[in-house]
Amino acid sequence: MKRTFQPSTLKRNRSHGFRARMSTKNGRHILSRRRSKFRTRLTVSSN
């Protein structure tokens, strides 16, 4: 049986990356929330 998680960096960044977050209002809310918590990694793309 094939596993459900088939990792792909491109798909990952397109859905959860910094540019994807910045493109929507709610995405920017996510980033501001993570900044307020002093997260070292805001998104998956910014390692």
UniProtKB/Swiss-Prot annotation:
PROSITE patterns: RIBOSOMAL_L34 (PS00784). Residues 1-10 have a biased composition (Polar residues). Keywords: Ribonucleoprotein, Ribosomal protein. GO terms for molecular function: structural constituent of ribosome. It comes from the Bacteria. GO terms for cellular component: ribonucleoprotein complex; ribosome. GO terms for biological process: translation. Residues 1-20 are annotated as: Disordered. Belongs to the bacterial ribosomal protein bL34 family. PANTHER family: LARGE RIBOSOMAL SUBUNIT PROTEIN BL34M, MITOCHONDRIAL RIBOSOMAL PROTEIN 34 FAMILY MEMBER. HAMAP family: Ribosomal_bL34. This is Large ribosomal subunit protein bL34. It comes from Buchnera aphidicola subsp. Baizongia pistaciae (strain Bp). The gene is rpmH.
